[in-house]
Amino acid sequence: MELPKDFLHEIESLLGSDEANALCHALTETEVPTSVRINPLKHPSALPPTESEVPWCETGMYLKERPKFTYDPMFHAGCYYVQEAASMFIEQAYRTITTDFVPQRLLDLCAAPGGKSTLWRSLLPTGTLLVANEPIRQRAQVLAENLTKWGQPDVVCTSAYPEEFAPLGSFFDVIATDVPCSGEGMFRKDEGAVNEWSIQAVDACAARQWDIVQSVWPALREGGYLV
């Protein structure tokens, strides 16, 4: 797979040759093992065969091979969630920002299909509130279904645009914003993502990200964290 020249130039200027080459290798040649995250409240009696633990997530596991999850009742019961290990890294962000305080209200602004929301809810202490939001109504339905299967309490699922949270005024201790990105992580999965990449697309995503963050910013309390 040949990566866009503008992309190669950008990452080399930002990272240097060694790290840029390692990133290119990861995006084009490295096979990604299937990983799952265990639901700490359900303790499944049986899991697909595991290979090793995900180092940055206490409940994350790599599988030896990818099974047909649709045939596994444990999957449908919400005993585990299939999620790329990279997405589990938000656990490290949570542990970093909670060294000096315990968040009482967390907003996951762009939450569908629900992988990160289920992890946020597993990390938050009992009695705290998670608001899992997805602006697109159809995707919000998938989000609600996955949160229901996960089965943990103190979750509100909403379908609102970022600016609709602003009137709450300093309500949330943490706002997690998985804002739209230019999709370099999809290169290994979809060659179409390589063809669609451009500097213009990156700039457009950056502008959209800024608009989203500005819109929701008033809902974050002073001293809170935007992730």
Where are these predicted regions, by residue range?
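S-adenosylmethionine
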Residues: M1-V227
